[in-house]
Amino acid sequence: MTLTIYNTLTRRQEPLETVEPGKVKMYCCGVTVYDYCHLGHARSYIVWDTIRRYLIWRGFGVKYIQNFTDIDDKILNRAKEQGLTMAEVSNRFIDAYFADIRRLNVLDADEYPRVTEHIPEIHQLIQILEEKGLAYAVGGDVYYRVERFPSYGKLSGRELEQMQAGASGRVDAEDSEPKKQHPFDFALWKAAKPGEPAWDSPWGAGRPGWHIECSAMIRSKLGATIDIHGGGGDLIFPHHENEIAQSEAAMNQPLARYWTHNGMVMVNGQKMSKSLGNFITIRELLDGVGSWKEDPVNPMAVRLFVLQAHYRKPLDFTEEAIATAENSWKTLKEGLLFGYQYGEKLGWGQESAIIPELATRFQELGDDDFNFSGGLAVLFELAKELRREGNILVHEGTTKTPSDELQRQWNTLVTLAKILGLEAKLDDETQTQAGLSDTDIEALIEQRQAARKNKNFSESDRIRNELQAQGVTLIDSPQGTRWHRS
C-alpha cells in the first residue's frame, strides 16, 4: 500500500516520497502567544499530532517542529494593557498552551523554536535575499520584492497582476506604506518604534516581520527542504505564500514537498469570533466555564469530535455535535477498558497480537490522505463488540466469543486507538457510557423488580425510563431481567 497526501501546492493527492527515505521532516506553524488557545487551535494541533503518530506507526522516523511566535503586535498590545513585558506575556501563554494542549493528549513536538531565539538566523536569510536583489531597505525597514519571484501566488492559485488589479486601492495599512515599491511587497524587517522591543541589525534597530520568522526557523531546524509543511487553511495566503517566496528565492530549492492544510472550525455555522460571542477556548470547553455554558467536556471527546471529520473539511462545532462526541467516546472507552475490567477473569496472558485484517483496513484508510474519520469505524466495530461481550459476561459469567479472540480484538482496538491519540485512563474503569457502574445498574434493576412484585408499576416504569435515558436497555424474560448499554 502507498501512503498518499493531498498537496495544496499541486491540488492533487500524491504518493509520499520523502527527501530522505524512511524519514519525515515536518513543520507546523505554531501559535502567536498572546491569549489562550481556542477551538481552531485544538483542531490544528490534534490533526498534526495524529498525522505524526500515524507516520510513526507506518514506520517513518519523524522530526516534528512547531514554533512559537513570541514577538508580534498583538503580544505588545496585550503587554501594554496588562502592564507587563513582552516576555512575561509570551511566557505566560506558552505555559498555558502546554497546559491546555497536553490535556487533549497532543504529544510535544521535538522542538519549539521561538522567534526571539532566532534573530541572527533571520538576519542571515534577509541578507541573502538582499544580495540576490529580492529585498530592499528603506528607512530602517526591509521589504521583499514580490515582482522578482515569478511564481509568486502558486500556492494560493493567485496571480500577482490579478491581485494588484483586484485590490483597487483596498490594501491594508502595511500594503499602502509609501516606502514600498509594490503594494504586495511585505516586510522582512521593521524599524524600531519608541517603547517597543528591538534588536540591532544591519539595517538598524528593529524586529522581524511575521513571514520571515518561519522561513528562518525551518532552515535552522530542518534544512532547506522539508517533507510536510502543515497549518490551517487560513494561512495559505499570505503567510505560506510568502514563506515560499522567501525560502525558495534564497535557497533555490523547494521549501516543502507537501503543503497540507486543515479546514476551519465554525461555531453553529458561523466563523468563530469574539465579536459574535462564540469564541470558545480549550480550557473553557474542558472546564465548563466562561463562554462554554454547558458541562465540562471530556478531552477525549474533543479529540474524537475533531477526528470524526476529514482534516481538510470544515468542522462545525455545535452543542449537539459535542454531545454526540461525548456519547461516542463513552462507547469507545468501554471497549478500551474491557481488558482492564475482564482480562484477568478471562485468563488472558501477555499476548499482544492484533487482527491483521482490521489493521489492514485501518491502514488503507489512513494511507488515503489520512482518512482517520474512516478509520474510526474500525474502532467502533471493535468497541461495540467488546461492550456486548462485557454485558454477556456480567450476566452469564461467560462470553460467546472465545477468550483468545476477545484478547486479539481488545489488543487491536487499543493499538489502533492509540495511533489516533484516543486512550482511556485506568481511573475511568468504573465509569460507563451511562455514567453508572455495573453495580449501580444492578441495584436499580433490583429496586424495579421489587416495585413490580408490589404491583407498583409507575415506579417500575420510572426506573426503566431512568435507565433508558442513561443509555441502558432492559430486556424482561421469564428467566429474569437482562440489560445492555445501547
Swiss-Prot record:
Its cofactor is Zn(2+). GO terms for molecular function: ATP binding; cysteine-tRNA ligase activity; zinc ion binding. A motif ('KMSKS' region) lies at residues 271-275. Its EC number is 6.1.1.16. The keyword Transcription does not apply. ATP binds at K274. Binds 1 zinc ion per subunit. A motif ('HIGH' region) lies at residues 31-41. GO terms for cellular component: cytosol. Zn(2+) binds at C29, C214, H239, E243. Keywords: Aminoacyl-tRNA synthetase, ATP-binding, Cytoplasm, Ligase, Metal-binding, Nucleotide-binding, Protein biosynthesis, Zinc. It catalyses: tRNA(Cys) + L-cysteine + ATP = L-cysteinyl-tRNA(Cys) + AMP + diphosphate. SMART domains: DALR_2. The keyword Lipid metabolism does not apply. Pfam families: CysS_C (PF23493), DALR_2 (PF09190), tRNA-synt_1e (PF01406). It is found in: Cytoplasm. Belongs to the class-I aminoacyl-tRNA synthetase family. Monomer. NCBIfam families: cysS (TIGR00435). This is Cysteine--tRNA ligase. It comes from Nostoc sp. (strain PCC 7120 / SAG 25.82 / UTEX 2576).
